[in-house]
Each structure stands twice: as C-alpha cells, then as structure tokens.
Design a protein with these regions (language model features):
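Phosphate/nucleotide-binding beta-alpha loop and adjacent structural elements of enzyme active sites
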Residues: 1-239
Length: 239
C-alpha cells in the first residue's frame, strides 16, 4: 500500500512533498553537471534511485555506489551487473576498519553507523558489523570525479573528512544531506560542515538556489537552515 501511494505521488505534475522536491532538484543538478563521460559517486546508494539518474545522464562514465547493508548491496550488484557501475559493500567514514552499524529493518533508509532519531515510535532495528573505509584510501587517485551524492543519515561530516584529498583533487559538485535528528548523533554540526567546505574553498547553497543561480549561504544562514529545520538537503560546489 505504501509503495503504491509513493508511486502515485511521483506521477503528480507537481512536487507533493519536500522529499519529492529534493528528488526533482537532484535530478536537475545531475542533468546540468554531468556530461556523457562524467564519473560519479553515490554514497548511501540504497536502492539505486539516484544512481539510475546518474547512469542515464552519464552513460559513458564509470560510477561507484557505496552501500553497507548486505541485502541491499547484493540487490545493487545484481541490478548493475552489466553496467558501468561498481558497487562497494562499505560504509564510508573517516576511519578504516570494522564498525557496529544500526540497521533499521523496518525502514532501511534510516540506517547508519550511529542510531539516529526516528519519526515513528515502532521502528525495528538490529546491530550488524560492517566494513568502514575512507574514500581517500579506497578510491583510485587517477579517476576524475564530477559529482558526489552523500545520504548517510547523519554521517556526512565523517564521509567528507575521509574524502578531503579526493575533493581537493577532483573538485566535484557535492549533493549532501545534513539535518537535525541525525547529524548531531555523529557530533556533527552546521558550523563544522561549513568550516570544512570553507577550508576546501567551497560554497554551500540550497539545491534550488544553485539551479536558479542565486547566492550561497553565509554561516549564519546555513545554521538557520539546520537548527530551524528549514531544509536538510544541500549542494556544495567550488567557489
């Protein structure tokens, strides 16, 4: 029933929910940024919905998906078996090793290295072990990257900290989630995220603002987005 409702909402001629608006904006950014041979990373690949869009707009590139939940990883490997996509069964972070991972069985999209707040009272979760790795260690130093999408339920700062050299080298456009209810469980904050991107000479904007060529956020503006729960999906891009 829930999947049927979601499919009906997707067919509406307007954005019914904030998540649907984010999806529309993400698709528009991918279309604008990617050339046919662009290479992209989907960190927190889940079912591959964003990766599908990437493959459509960059059919000649080499793309990489990262998904630590074993069952979802296996599904992705099968789905992309005969494509130009490589799927890694790993949780990207700022450390290398093995870590406990909170798998939300009833709502896998809420899963992460730390247990986040839930919107519903009866979510069912379990603790599993997953491999963690820094993108800087895992990724080929010679491959150019045009776009990175990060949706890891609060762990985005850790992912970014483990990808500093890759970002410096390739200067990709980065679409990322950062919201109250998840990010604070990783000792993350908009101040820390803003400082990291500033050190990389990056701006942060709403996706819609970037698409409309509007100005980027100041620190105070970005903080207000987070603490007042105005938005939780953003784009970072080189100045």
């Amino acid at each position: 029933m829930l999947d049927t409702l979601k499919n009906l909402i997707k067919k509406l001629p307007f954005d019914f929910t904030k998540n649907q608006a984010y999806d529309t904006q993400t698709n528009a950014i991918i279309k604008r940024v990617c050339k046919k041979n662009s290479n992209c990373l989907d960190i927190g690949c889940h079912k591959g919905e964003v990766l599908d869009v990437i493959v459509h707009h960059a059919p000649d590139g080499h793309h990489f998906g990262f998904e630590p939940i074993p069952s979802m990883y296996k599904t992705l490997v099968t789905k992309y078996a005969n494509t130009n996509c490589t799927i890694h069964e790993v949780a990207l972070s700022n450390t290398s090793g093995v870590s406990v991972f909170n798998h939300v069985v009833s709502n896998p999209a809420y899963s992460g290295l730390e247990k986040r707040a839930y919107d519903k009272p009866n979510e069912v979760d379990e603790q599993i072990e997953v491999k963690t790795e820094k993108l800087d260690i895992l990724f080929d130093k010679k491959t150019p990257i045009d776009l990175i999408k990060i949706d890891v339920e609060g762990g985005e700062l850790n992912v970014l900290e483990g990808a500093i050299e890759t970002i410096k080298r390739t200067k990709p456009v980065i679409i990322f989630e950062h919201g109250l209810g998840a990010s604070e469980f990783y000792d993350s904050s908009p101040e820390k995220v803003f400082a990291l991107f500033t050190s990389l000479n990056y701006n942060i904007s709403l996706m819609k603002s970037w698409l409309d060529d509007k100005s980027s956020f100041t620190l105070d503006e970005f903080k207000n987005q987070f603490y007042e729960k105005r938005n939780y999906y953003f784009i970072a891009y080189p100045k």
